[in-house]
Swiss-Prot record:
Keyword set includes Ubl conjugation: no
Keywords: Cell cycle, Cell division, Cytoplasm, Cytoskeleton, GTP-binding, Meiosis, Microtubule, Mitosis, Nucleotide-binding
UniProt-listed GO biological process terms: attachment of meiotic spindle microtubules to kinetochore; cell division; cytoplasmic microtubule organization; meiotic spindle organization; microtubule nucleation; mitotic cell cycle; mitotic sister chromatid segregation; mitotic spindle organization
Gene symbol of the encoding locus: gammaTub37C
Name of this protein: Tubulin gamma-2 chain
Keyword Cell division found: yes
Family statement: Belongs to the tubulin family.
Effect of gene knockout: RNAi-mediated knockdown in oocytes results in spindle defects.
Provenance organism: Drosophila melanogaster (Fruit fly)
Entries under Pfam families matching the protein: Tubulin, Tubulin_C
Localization (cell): Cytoplasm, Cytoskeleton, Microtubule organizing center, Centrosome; Cytoplasm, Cytoskeleton, Spindle
Length: 457
């Protein structure tokens, strides 16, 4: 029985990466931009109905809800060649169209005001599913709509559908650039609190690392949003391959997350992908790829889509790893590669659990040609991700100490009387950092926030 997934795209960034994701899915399943199955798409071994449903005339419609408080990005989607793909009733645009002004508080309170309309769409979409498994939410944590309204929707979703899984693809800001959003540290910490409390799994898409990969690995001097979003859509489509081309394991969202997330709070995942190749690279630069080569490269920090401390010199370690390997793969090669990785101690694992690298070998789309014999995506739970949260906390503390740029927050009802919500959010993220650090120790199974607090006291 297919387990359907509803995708929510929130804000400018969420809708842009969502758009690239659907373009990619259409390509992989042989669906034309207007939702009609291509004549050549006769394979029939894929599960389109996890992410699409069929209209009365049999054309495919994404199980997607597009939400924004300003119209530009959604208008671009609706005037693109893919405009007929979407269900127009699943598009929510704020009537005043003024956006959230990159302010989390504004996005959150606007979410509250329009919740009825938004959840009418979501309820209708959920009721139309035979066996809904969960929701995927695409957004950014730094702006106003994706972070603020995204946080509001996340809270309500987890209350309204407590038995359904919520996975997010969350874009973290580029730390190498000076942001034009001065309140970005506040937005990030407030959103991280909701991602910690309300999501079951968060795939971290770190703009710092994505830009670094585009420049260093793909040799693109100044990467455009489209090029970065292409990278993101590759990660999103590969991370859902086992759901769309099912095999005997990891063929639903719960199976996928259960192997990666052993304890509820440690649910922030990083990804790595290899081999990377840009559009401008020629066929001559294609090298030989083997299973061992791909699995070894996936463990290298430079192929990680997160700029966190993952090197073996640090105390940080892997909690779990799932490698999704595609192409010409002999299962015996997988076994040999795992043995080699273990012998050479190429991956440093937690001391309190099994050192397991799981490997999934889903089929590739027969409609998309790859230049490489073998390619792989790693989804990893790694304690080094806490360095990303520490960076966010340091930037937050710098602003909060001076109470800088808080006027726009105080205009919203949540912050009118006091700023407690900001401090609670900071404590939540700080506790998350402590838990990831505790996970590097052998006594982690006995760890609890209360014990940690009493030590500090």
């Amino acid at each position: 029985m297919p387990s359907e997934i509803i995708t929510l795209q929130l804000g400018q960034c969420g809708n842009q990466i969502g758009f690239e994701f659907w373009k990619r899915l259409c390509l992989e399943h042989g669906i034309s931009p207007d939702g009609v199955l291509e004549d050549f798409a006769t394979d029939g071994q894929d599960r389109k109905d996890v992410f699409f449903y069929q209209a009365d005339d049999n054309h495919y419609i994404p199980r997607a809800v597009l939400i924004d408080l300003e119209p530009r990005v959604i208008n671009n989607i609706m005037t693109s060649p893919y405009s007929k793909l979407y269900n127009q009733e699943n598009v929510f645009l704020s009537k005043h169209g003024g956006g959230a002004g990159n302010n989390w508080a504004s996005g959150f309170s606007q979410g509250e005001k329009v919740q009825e309309e938004v959840f009418d769409i979501l309820d209708r979409e959920a009721d139309g599913s035979d066996s809904l498994e969960g929701f995927v939410l695409c957004h950014s944590i730094a702006g106003g709509t994706g972070s603020g309204m995204g946080s509001y929707v996340l809270e309500r979703l987890s209350e309204r559908f407590p038995k359904k899984l919520i996975q997010t693809y969350s874009v973290f800001p580029n730390q190498d650039e000076i942001s034009d959003v001065v309140v970005q540290p506040y937005n990030s910490i407030l959103t991280l609190k909701r991602l910690t409390k309300c999501a079951d799994s968060v795939v971290v898409l770190d703009n710092t690392a994505l830009n670094r990969i585009a420049t260093e690995r793909l040799h693109i001097q100044t990467p455009t949003f489209t090029q970065i979003n292409n990278l993101v859509s590759t990660i999103m489509s590969l991370s859902t391959t086992t759901l769309r081309y099912p095999s005997y394991m990891n063929n639903n969202l719960i199976g996928l997350t259960a192997s990666l997330i052993p304890t509820p709070q440690l649910h922030f995942l990083m990804t790595g992908y290899t081999p990377l190749m840009s559009d401008c690279e020629t066929k001559t630069s294609v090298r030989k790829t083997t299973v061992l080569d791909v699995m070894r490269r996936l463990l290298q920090p430079k192929n990680m889509m997160v700029s966190a401390l993952t090197d073996k010199q640090s105390r940080q370690c892997f909690v779990s790893i799932l490698n999704i390997i595609q192409g010409e793969v002999d299962p015996s090669q997988v076994h040999k590669s795992l043995q080699r990785i273990r012998e050479r101690k190429l991956a440093n694992f937690i001391p309190w659990g099994p050192a397991s690298i799981q490997v999934a070998l889903p089929r590739s789309s027969p409609y998309v040609q790859s230049a490489h014999k073998v390619s792989g995506l790693m989804m990893a739970n790694h304690t080094g991700i806490s360095s990303l949260f520490k960076r966010a906390l340091a930037q937050y503390d710098k602003l909060r100490k001076r109470n800088a740029f808080l006027d726009n927050f105080r205009r919203e009802s949540m912050f009118q009387d006091d700023l407690t919500e900001l401090d609670i959010a900071r404590d939540t993220v700080d506790c998350l950092v402590q838990e990831y650090e505790a996970a590097t120790q052998i006594d982690y199974p006995q760890w609890s926030p209360a014990v940690e607090a009493s030590k500090a006291g």
